[in-house]
Regions:
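Long, low-complexity intrinsically disordered regions enriched in small/polar
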Residues: 1-41
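Intrinsic-disorder/coil detector with helix-boundary
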Residues: 31-323, 327-361
């Protein structure tokens, strides 16, 4: 890639601005139409600005459709097919693995990094989020990314040996100041939606009053009337200082969860930067969060299978920047389902492109 491209992609002035109000009304832009994909063409002569790699087909489709561009196929019949397109002045390449995990993602990211010479290696997709620090649909930006199951295993236990890959400081600042209001997947909630969020937290054994997402789902001033209404309807009962579900309340939220097969289209999600721990297996164990804290990462926000690989490939191939953005689809608990998977994949792609555009600006 030429020097002119390097200067044009990332400048020192790129930063995000804070705007919008979670309690206000948002004029949401219409969802873009599914993007066109044109026939195979020659490999880009001058490389690309950003290479986006996903692990799953659903994540790939979300990243493809959220870009709002016309894509061009490359090597459609080869071992590593990919698409190219342009968005916000950035030349993009998009590819996917055929299955989850580092062993599938690493060779694709490495091969295309050598061929396309990107200035940023990125990934969008889904992850598990810490149930007390994130809500389903929230978007986590990895900082740092690390492999949590690297280390030494003996008959008496496991000792971690973690290599951390921190996010660029300027990018971290932009993430911390980023406000997702205005993205197609962002929307406020109220009334019955707030009640359902409250009841679902109780159903999962959480304390809604102390949950980090409470101000977004139950705006200031709404709580007293809401709990009074739910209590009057016989859905909750106060025991000591904590609200508990009654049988009627449990039946209502279980019926709602069982009937919600498509998941949400819009949520008041937050964009959070924090540690993302990558492992080699899908986790359905709520004890994972305490174990990760016991290994020394007390503020871990998310668990996935590929973030550390993306950061490692960027480091080893001397790619100037990397960015892993993933939407929370569950809390790594045994009751996990795919209700939020579609939303999480789409929201993460929208946030990824928005962050890239702001950095480009």
């Amino acid at each position: 890639m030429t020097g002119d491209m390097n200067v044009g992609l990332w400048n020192d002035g790129g930063h995000a601005t804070v705007n919008g109000d979670v309690g206000g009304t948002i004029n949401r832009p219409a969802r873009p139409e599914p993007d066109r994909v044109e026939p195979d063409r020659a490999e880009p002569a001058h490389g690309v600005d950003v290479l986006v790699v996903t692990a799953l087909l659903e994540e790939f489709e979300a990243a493809r459709d959220a870009a709002g561009t016309t894509w061009h196929k490359h090597d459609a019949d080869g071992p590593v097919p990919y698409l190219t397109g342009e968005r916000a002045g950035l030349r993009l390449a998009l590819a996917r693995a055929t299955t989850m995990g580092a062993r599938s993602v690493a060779p694709i990211a490495a091969q295309l990094a050598l061929r396309l010479r990107p200035q940023c290696l990125a990934m969008s997709g889904v992850c598990a989020g810490h149930p007390d620090r994130t809500a389903p649909g929230d978007v986590v930006v990895a900082d740092p990314a690390y492999e949590y199951d690297e280390g030494r295993l003996t008959g008496t236990g496991f000792t971690g040996e973690h290599r951390h890959y921190p996010l660029d400081t300027r990018q971290l600042r932009a993430v911390q100041e980023f406000e997702p209001a205005g993205l197609p997947t962002y929307g406020t909630v109220g009334g019955e939606e707030s009640e359902n969020w409250f009841l679902e937290r109780l159903h999962h054994g959480q304390e809604p009053r102390l949950h980090a997402a409470r101000p977004r789902y139950v705006p200031p001033g709404v709580w007293p009337a809401m709990v009074s209404r739910l209590e009057g309807d016989g859905l909750i009962v106060l025991r000591g200082r904590r609200w508990n579900l009654t049988r009627a309340g449990r039946l209502r939220i279980e019926r709602l969860m069982a009937g919600d097969v498509d998941g949400p289209d819009r949520l008041p999600f937050a964009v959070l930067a924090g540690p993302m721990a990558s492992g080699s297996a899908v986790v359905a164990d709520p004890g994972i969060w305490d174990r990760l804290a016991g290994m020394g990462e007390r503020k871990v926000l998310a668990v996935d299978m590929e973030a550390a690989t993306i950061a490692m490939v960027a480091h080893d191939h001397r790619i100037p920047d990397w960015l892993v953005v993933k939407g929370v689809m569950d809390g790594a608990d045994p009751a996990k389902d795919d209700r939020f998977k579609r939303f999480a994949a789409r929201a993460s792609a929208e946030v990824l492109y928005a962050l890239l555009a702001e950095r480009r600006a």
